[in-house]
Amino acid sequence: MTNSNKVLKLGLPKGSLQDSTLDLFAHAGFHFSVQSRSYFPSIDDDELEAILIRAQEMAHYVQLGAFDVGLTGKDWIIETDADVVEVADLVYSKASMRPVRWVLAVPESSPVKTVKDLEGKHIATEVVNITKKYLAANGVNASVEFSWGATEVKPPDLADAIVEVTETGSSLRANKLRIVETILESNTKLIANRQSWEDPWKREKIESMALLLQGAINAQGKVGLKMNAPKSALEKITSIIPALRQPTVSHLANDQWVALEVIVTEKIVRKLIPELKRAGAEGIFEYDINKLID
């Protein structure tokens, strides 16, 4: 079998993570096209076959070998007790570039202050196994019921407390719920089937994918700046650039001038560019960065 007809089976998360995942892959250089109601995206890489499936099931199917590689949360790996290779941490979520939290929450009016106060109470959640382990670790005996969704509406009539995932806590506050404790922080992970990981071609393909995806995450919120400057202003200019690394300085044909290139955080650019101009920089050029590889 030649490399030209080898294929890596990729599982992509369907649902809340779908759009942010496809956007991340696009920045990494993999462009998917998803037709309405289709679970089989097309991709501009003949060595990849992708299927959309719920993140909750991903680790299970990667373990079975239905997928060589997939993306899911640390939470679902733990919840399903899946035996997979955790290739890379990809810290992004539905609406932000940060981890999510599974939290224990109760109605604002509830007397519950800690998990200990839930002895003999009823808890609703999607992560039954994680919740049971958490209760056991705290010596609490409470009943845990699987929730099919809309978990925030269940207290106080259908449950005394819930364990729910949140990025900002806004949905919980909107439903008049109060966070008692954080049970687990979770982020997206690139995971691989153990047999696939032992295949040299598949492993190299997976590692390359991980490198590009991590590079796309590293580049989020960053831009590049290029500019020319007289040597006499170089020290002043470099002193005001809060760079991720020291600027790259290149000599120009005019030996009294240099070219500078630097990567900075995008949110400071509107303040930084006028300062650079006043310090003597010319020909300032800002450009987007898709990937930043360490």
UniProtKB/Swiss-Prot annotation:
<keyword id="KW-0808">Transferase</keyword>
<dbReference type="InterPro" id="IPR015867">
    <property type="entry name" value="N-reg_PII/ATP_PRibTrfase_C"/>
</dbReference>
<comment type="pathway">
    <text>Amino-acid biosynthesis; L-histidine biosynthesis; L-histidine from 5-phospho-alpha-D-ribose 1-diphosphate: step 1/9.</text>
</comment>
<dbReference type="InterPro" id="IPR013115">
    <property type="entry name" value="HisG_C"/>
</dbReference>
<dbReference type="Pfam" id="PF08029">
    <property type="entry name" value="HisG_C"/>
</dbReference>
<comment type="similarity">
    <text>Belongs to the ATP phosphoribosyltransferase family. Long subfamily.</text>
</comment>
<keyword id="KW-0067">ATP-binding</keyword>
<dbReference type="InterPro" id="IPR011322">
    <property type="entry name" value="N-reg_PII-like_a/b"/>
</dbReference>
<keyword id="KW-0368">Histidine biosynthesis</keyword>
<dbReference type="InterPro" id="IPR001348">
    <property type="entry name" value="ATP_PRibTrfase_HisG"/>
</dbReference>
<dbReference type="GO" id="GO:0000105">
    <property type="term" value="P:L-histidine biosynthetic process"/>
</dbReference>
<protein>
    <recommendedName>
        <fullName>ATP phosphoribosyltransferase</fullName>
        <ecNumber>2.4.2.17</ecNumber>
    </recommendedName>
</protein>
<keyword id="KW-0028">Amino-acid biosynthesis</keyword>
<keyword id="KW-0547">Nucleotide-binding</keyword>
<dbReference type="GO" id="GO:0003879">
    <property type="term" value="F:ATP phosphoribosyltransferase activity"/>
</dbReference>
<dbReference type="GO" id="GO:0000287">
    <property type="term" value="F:magnesium ion binding"/>
</dbReference>
<dbReference type="InterPro" id="IPR013820">
    <property type="entry name" value="ATP_PRibTrfase_cat"/>
</dbReference>
<keyword id="KW-0460">Magnesium</keyword>
<keyword id="KW-0328">Glycosyltransferase</keyword>
<dbReference type="GO" id="GO:0005524">
    <property type="term" value="F:ATP binding"/>
</dbReference>
<dbReference type="Pfam" id="PF01634">
    <property type="entry name" value="HisG"/>
</dbReference>
<dbReference type="GO" id="GO:0005737">
    <property type="term" value="C:cytoplasm"/>
</dbReference>
<keyword id="KW-0963">Cytoplasm</keyword>
<keyword id="KW-0479">Metal-binding</keyword>
<comment type="function">
    <text>Catalyzes the condensation of ATP and 5-phosphoribose 1-diphosphate to form N'-(5'-phosphoribosyl)-ATP (PR-ATP). Has a crucial role in the pathway because the rate of histidine biosynthesis seems to be controlled primarily by regulation of HisG enzymatic activity.</text>
</comment>
<dbReference type="InterPro" id="IPR020621">
    <property type="entry name" value="ATP-PRT_HisG_long"/>
</dbReference>
